[in-house]
Amino acid sequence: GEQMVVDVPYLDYYVHAYVWRVNVGRISLYLLDTDNEMNSEFDRSITHQLYGGDWENRLKQEILLGIGGILTLKKLGIKKDIYHCNEGHAALINVQRICDYVAEGLTYDQAIELVRASSLYTVHTPVPAGHDYFDEGLFGKYMGGYPSRMGISWDDLMDLGRNNPGDKGERFCMSVFACNTSQEVNGVSWLHGKVSQEMFASIWKGYFPEESHVGYVTNGVHFPTWSATEWKHLYAAHFDENFLYDQSNPKIWEAIYNVSDEEIWKTRMVMKNKLIDYVRKQYRETWLKNQGDPSRIVSLLDKINPNALLIGFGRRFATYKRAHLLFTDLDRLAKIVNNPDYPVQFLFTGK
C-alpha cells in the first residue's frame, strides 16, 4: 500500500510525517518520521534525535508527538476511551482533543471537562528542572493559532500551563498543562507520589498537597524480556511452572527462600563478570577508536576489581538526574572507597 502521511500544522505551514508501524509482540507501535523530502531541511531533523537540539526543536518535537499523535490516531481510525500522557512531552494531545470537541459543536467548558475525564498523566521527574518550560514568545510562535480553535483567548491557554495564572512573566510548563487537563495524575512509586504532590501543590491553591489528585502507580517490569537468561534459568528450576502466568501472586515468590545463598551468589557473580567483560571490551574499542594511548588502556582496565562491590549509575546525563549526589559528602565517600577490607568501585554510564 501507499505510505501513510500525517500533516501536522506548524506556524503557517505543515510538517509532513511518515507513519511507521512496528509490531511489538501483540502491540502495534506507531512511529512518526519527519525525515522525508516533503519537509524543509530544518523540519526533516525534528525526529533525528530524542532530546536533541535547542528549545525550539524540542517544542517542535512535542507538537509532533502530542498534536501529531492525536492526528495519527484519527487517521488510523483508532478511538479510545482513555488517553494516557506518559510524561509532559506528550501533553499537547489535550490541545488537539479540545480542538476536536469544539469543532464538533461543544463549548470549551464542555470540551475540557470531557478531555479531563478521559485523561491520565504520569509524571516521572521528581525535580522542577526536569520539566519542560517554554517562553511565551517561542510558544506563541508555534501555538498562536490554537486558542481560537479551542474557543479561548491566548492568555487562557498560557494560564493552563502556569502555576500562577495571570503571571505574564511565567513560562508555559507542559507538566502543569498536563495536570490541569487530566483527571488523574500519578508518580511512579509511593514516595515519588508524595514528592509529586509537593512539587505540584501550587497548582491547586487552597488545598493541602495530600488533597490533590496526584497519586502513584509503582513501576514494574516485563519479566520475560527484562530478566537476564541466567536468572530465568534459576526461577525455572525452583519456581512453580505457572510462575510466568501468576507473577503478581506473593505466595509464588516465596519459593525464592528455597534457593540456597550459594546458588544466588554464583548467579550474581556470573552476571557481574559478564558486565565487567563487556565494559572492558567497549572501553577498549572506544579508546582505540578515539586514538587514545594504548598503554593507558591496560592501566585503567587493570584497576577493575571483580571482587569489589560494584555500584552502577546508568542514566541520561542531564543535570536533574543528579549523578553528582555521590559527591555530596566527600569525607564519608573517602572512608568508603579507601577501605582496603571492603573495596568499592563505581560504574557510570550515560545514554
Question: Language model features by range: what are they?
Answer:
Residues G1-K351:
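Catalytic cores of carbohydrate-active enzymes across secretory and cytosolic contexts
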